[in-house]
Structures are given as C-alpha cells and as structure tokens.
Amino acid sequence: MTLSEINAQIMFQTNNDIDDLGDFKPHITDYINQGYDLLVEAYTGEHVTADSETYPALVDNSDKPNLPEYSHRAIVDFATYLIYRNGNIVKQNRGQAYYSAFYEVLVKLKYEGGTRNKPLRFINIYKD
C-alpha cells in the first residue's frame, strides 16, 4: 500500500465524514507515521526517522511501508483509531475496534520478529 492508498483507506473507514475532515487532515500523515513507527519497533526494534535508510518516514504519496504486506492495513487501522479517539463517546467506541485490529497485527509482528524478537536457542550454556 502506498501513502496515497493508505490515506484513501482512512477516508473510507471514517465514512468520508467531511465535518471532521478539517480536524484531522493536517495530522493524518503524523498519525500514519506514528502507527508505522510502532509496527517497525515491534518488528525490528528500530524507529522510523526521516533520515533512516531502512525505515524512512512516509512522506511522498508513492512511499510504501517497509514491512510485510499484511501489516499495511494495521497502519490504516491505527490512524483511524487516532482520529476517533478524541471524538464523542460513539466515535471513541467505534475507534476501539480499529485499535484492537491494529494490536493483533502488532503482536503478530512482534512474534514474527525481524531481528529483535527471534527466539534464542542455546546449544550449550556451559563453557568447556
């Protein structure tokens, strides 16, 4: 998913609510990169930064997250959750489902673990 596809999916998940668009549109890229950073940290232990070669922040509409394809939808879910979290109680309840979906993928990425979370196996713990 590219950044523009992620933006389009967020608009779809928020029901294209024009009334709220002005409130969250300036922050939507920050929300996306925040979710991306959480997933990258769970997967590799690194953080998303603007000058990173492996995990740069998503800025251009053609940028793609450098994570497994199945996790891209979780970035959308996290951004949608952040949009809904400051709304009325109905919107907050709606946002919880998106956070739960995000968290499931976060746990899966952490378990899958790129380099940081791989299970360790000791062949011999005693020195001869």
Please name every model-derived segment.
Residues 88-98:
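Short conserved catalytic/interaction loops centered on acidic-Pro-aromatic/His motifs
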Residues 80-87:
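Extended, well-ordered alpha-helical segments in internal regulatory regions
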Residues 1-64, 107-128:
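Conserved short "hinge" loops at termini or chain/domain junctions
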Residues 69-78:
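Elongated alpha-helical scaffolds
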Residues 7, 29, 76, 96-99:
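Extracytoplasmic/secreted envelope proteins and their assembly/folding machinery
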